[in-house]
């Protein structure tokens, strides 16, 4: 278990679990909750798969996962790509697909970090399920 400190604002805490015997489909699981919440209600649950320099394989797996979500939800997702905001050089890329639900969001994303950023991060696919409150916080909270 690792306490992950991605963001400057500490309103939410994210804990990561790697190589846990209960984790079958992902390399890493992240659970986020509001720091002040004594009941530890989950605000976000994420599954992460490492894709070391295999961005096309990541996109292929993401497409397969999105197909499963499309069979569950009646809403049309939004897909977009761009430069990752953490990498100020503009050499890291991502592709997101977002399913907006009434009380939350489901996002699948592939991130292809630049060689420099790979010293700190790893290329990966993330399946992100969160409350609207957490999603709004994460998008307004600088790294």
Residue ranges, per PLM feature:
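N-terminal Sec/ER secretory leader and immediately downstream segment
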Residues: 1-31
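Non-cytosolic coordination micro-motifs
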Residues: 1-3, 7-11, 44-143
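N-terminal low-complexity, intrinsically disordered segments
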Residues: 22-52
């Amino acid at each position: 278990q690792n306490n992950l400190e991605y963001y400057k604002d500490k309103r939410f805490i994210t804990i990561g679990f790697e190589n846990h015997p209960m984790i079958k489909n992902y390399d890493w699981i992240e659970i986020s909750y509001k720091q002040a919440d004594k009941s530890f209600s989950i605000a976000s649950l994420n599954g992460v798969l490492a894709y070391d320099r295999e961005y096309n394989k990541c996109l292929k797996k993401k497409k397969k996962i999105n197909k499963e979500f499309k069979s569950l939800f009646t809403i049309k997702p939004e897909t977009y790509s761009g430069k990752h905001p953490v990498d100020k050089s503009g050499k890291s890329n991502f592709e997101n697909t977002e399913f907006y639900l009434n009380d939350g969001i489901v996002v699948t994303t592939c991130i292809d970090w630049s060689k420099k950023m790979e010293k700190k991060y790893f290329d990966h696919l993330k399946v992100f399920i969160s409350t609207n409150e957490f999603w709004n916080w994460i998008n307004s909270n600088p790294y």
